[in-house]
């Protein structure tokens, strides 16, 4: 992938029709399965990301897809962050932070009062957890269809 270090980042809604975006979704799923035990992965595949109530965005730098993230409307003015993944060529460049801020802004604009997320446990998840906690997310109870296990954790942000 050709990176463009001086190009500005642009975040836009994505319909997952771009093969590069599809590849990043696959990379995300592979990463989740590689770092979590069977039955403990709740990441959405492409069909799950295309369902009603789910909005997907990509962060682009130049012509490259630098990251992906989604917001799932759970009803009751609550949203769930799904499928946050930065392409390996763009790590530590603020991609995930920009996507997270975008989701928070959109959630507020849609009248949501809370954002929640489920993520894994262990060293592979520490960078993401640090990002969420820096932004004000706090540990909390399981939500929606999730059940607490030793392999997952839940974070929430009141908007």
Where in this protein do the model-derived segments appear?
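Short, low-complexity, intrinsically disordered N-terminal peptides in bacterial proteins
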Residues: 1-10
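Acetyl-CoA-dependent GNAT
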Residues: 9-78, 82, 87, 100-101, ...
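Conserved acetyl-CoA-binding loop-helix of GNAT-fold acetyltransferases
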Residues: 86, 92-105, 130-134
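Conserved GNAT acetyl-CoA-binding A-motif
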Residues: 107-120
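Conserved beta-strand-loop-alpha-helix junction that forms the acyl-donor binding cleft
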Residues: 117-128, 146-150
């Amino acid at each position: 992938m050709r990176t463009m270090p001086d190009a500005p980042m642009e975040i836009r809604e994505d319909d997952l029709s771009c093969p590069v975006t599809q590849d990043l979704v696959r990379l995300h799923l592979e990463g989740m399965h590689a770092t979590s035990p069977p039955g403990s992965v709740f990441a959405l595949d492409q069909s799950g990301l295309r369902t009603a109530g789910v909005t997907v965005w990509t962060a682009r730098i130049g012509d490259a897809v630098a990251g992906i993230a989604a917001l799932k409307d759970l009803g009751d003015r609550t949203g769930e962050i799904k499928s946050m993944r930065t392409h390996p060529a763009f790590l530590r460049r603020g991609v995930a932070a920009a996507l997270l801020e975008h989701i928070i802004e959109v959630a507020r604009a849609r009248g949501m009062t809370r954002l929640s997320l489920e993520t894994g446990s262990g060293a592979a998840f520490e960078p993401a957890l640090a990002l969420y906690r820096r932004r004000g997310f706090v540990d909390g109870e399981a939500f929606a269809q999730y059940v607490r296990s030793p392999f997952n954790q839940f974070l929430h942000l009141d908007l």
